[in-house]
């Protein structure tokens, strides 16, 4: 298996047609078909369902597509990291994070960093903590921002001083919007939208106590933006950290803090004892300088 064949496979998967893919790759269609057929034979499984008009992926093909994208991304990161010119720092830094207030701290750090190293491209990948953690372990994300609790074994990190408050989102004309704080009894019997992350749900379960079993959970969501869209359409009340809904227009969605309050700390973390590129090492220096 080589990178070239994976690129061929991904192009066919994208175009869903061998002829169009061959044109994109500047090779003949028979050559492309022959090489991918040999690739399927090497793997011992079919990757494509070949229809009369289009091509779709088998289950094995879908799995390979996901892994192939990770491999291509990792290859590009390696090439970027090796292209450090003397006296000039270039390359790409990938930062994984969710939607929370600490992203404002990240923006402050990135602003200082970009003034010093304008040739470095910063890629922001928005995802759940579990996804970011997995991608860090795979080498696809250099730096992650996590809400606690998070397993910091094997990680170096700094803790952001400002805490994120937990809030309930609602339409501005909702009766709950008239309250200064939302108590757990206000939410019993109402359709709720909870975070998807199990450890966060456990924290909310502790807050609700024995009433947790009475909750009407209409949705779970891994990102606050999508939960906010559901709430704006009257489909539920998202319980999330304040940063996830901070930038909603107040004529669309408002938020009220819960009482008794729950606050959550945030960490910026990176893997320990990893030979990072110079661009990433300089970013870590800026992160540590911010803490100091």
Spans of features found by a protein language model:
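Hydrophobic two-helix hairpin corresponding to the core of helix-turn-helix DNA-binding domains
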Residues: 9, 21-22, 39, 58
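Short helix-boundary/capping micro-motifs
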Residues: 10-28
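A short LG(V/I)-centered, amphipathic sequence patch enriched
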Residues: 40-59
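Short beta-strand-centered segments that line the small-molecule binding cleft or hinge
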Residues: 66, 85, 108-112, 129-166, ...
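Central regulatory/effector-binding core of bacterial HTH transcription factors
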Residues: 88-152, 212, 220-223
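Beta-alpha-beta core module
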Residues: 153-159, 163-165, 222-273
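Flexible hinge/capping segments at coil-to-helix
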Residues: 155-166, 170-192
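Secondary-structure junction motif
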Residues: 190-212, 276-280, 284
């Amino acid at each position: 298996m080589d990178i070239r064949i994976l690129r061929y496979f991904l192009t066919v998967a994208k175009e869903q047609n061998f002829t169009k893919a061959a044109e994109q790759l500047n090779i003949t269609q028979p050559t492309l078909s022959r090489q991918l057929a040999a690739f399927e034979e090497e793997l011992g499984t079919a990757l494509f369902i070949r229809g009369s008009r289009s091509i779709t992926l088998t289950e094995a093909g879908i799995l390979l597509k996901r892994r192939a994208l990770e491999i291509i991304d990792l290859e590009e990161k390696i090439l970027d990291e090796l292209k450090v010119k003397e006296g000039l720092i270039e390359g790409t830094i990938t930062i994984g994070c969710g939607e929370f207030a600490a992203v404002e701290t990240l923006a402050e750090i990135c602003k200082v960093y970009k003034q010093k190293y304008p040739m470095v491209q910063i890629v922001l990948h928005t995802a759940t903590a579990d996804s970011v953690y997995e991608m860090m372990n795979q080498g696809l994300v250099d730096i992650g921002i996590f809400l606690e609790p998070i397993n910091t074994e094997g990680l170096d990190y700094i803790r952001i001083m400002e805490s994120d408050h937990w809030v309930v989102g609602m339409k501005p004309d909702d009766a709950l919007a008239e309250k200064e704080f939302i108590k757990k009894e206000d939410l019993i019997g109402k359709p709720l939208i909870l975070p998807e992350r199990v450890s966060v749900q456990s924290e909310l379960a502790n807050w609700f106590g024995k009433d947790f079993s009475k909750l009407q959970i209409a949705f779970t969501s891994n990102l606050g933006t999508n939960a906010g869209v559901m709430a704006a359409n009257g489909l539920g009340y998202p319980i999330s950290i304040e940063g996830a809904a901070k930038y909603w227009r107040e004529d669309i969605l408002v938020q009220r803090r819960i009482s008794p309050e729950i606050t959550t700390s945030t960490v910026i973390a990176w893997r320990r004892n990893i030979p990072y590129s110079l661009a990433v090492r300089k970013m870590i220096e800026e992160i540590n300088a911010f803490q100091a």
